[in-house]
Amino acid sequence: MALLLAGCQMQPPEPPDEDKAAIDRMLVLIDERLDVAPLVAQSKWNSGEPIEAPEREAQILDQVAEDAEAAGVDDAFARRFFDKQFEASKQVQRRLHHQWLQEGRSPFADPPDLAEEVRPVLDRLTPQLIEALADMQRIAEVEGAGRYLEQRAAELIQDDFDGEPRDVAIAPLRERFAP
């Protein structure tokens, strides 16, 4: 009986169900955003465009900071979060380009059009991610939220590599969350 009671006392606290749902939603959105990276990689493979696009990223980050502030999200937190989303996506793109180079891959027969097919998906996800960041900001200090984030990230974010893009994408959340 004493062991049973001790075991019950050792259970780490979990966040409330509504906070778990908010964390899951954020992780699903991150996964959706990472799912776009192979499409970007295909388009850039065919066009020869560089993976790095610092001017475009800077423009997006400026707009994200403005939109985040309007949504009550700390603009520095939003900038860091989206900067890491860019980095995670570029990791996937670089790995795919390296793989295709090693395979001697010829251009794709029907690559996605960045402007017409890919950017609209990213444009749809960005405000949803900002909204989810507002939730993350609210629950960052909830006891057990960090543990829940870690547990669910591996289940909900499938980056098809070794988990490094996932780790990069959730780094700003890890830094902010209570264990």
Residue ranges and their predicted role:
Residues Q9-Q11:
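Bacterial signal peptide processing site
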Residues D135-P179:
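Glycine-rich, aromatic-bearing surface loops/beta-hairpins
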Residues L5-G7:
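C-terminal motif of bacterial Sec signal peptides marking the signal peptidase cleavage site
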Residues L101-A140:
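Extended amphipathic alpha-helical interaction segments
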Residues I23-L27, W45-P54, E66-A71, P111-P120, ...:
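Second-shell loop/turn segments in exported
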Residues A70-F108:
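Mid-length scaffold segments of soluble, non-membrane domains
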Residues E14-E52:
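Immediate post-signal-peptide N-terminus of mature secreted/exported proteins
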Residues A22-R25, V36, R56, I60, ...:
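Stable alpha-helical elements in mature extracytoplasmic
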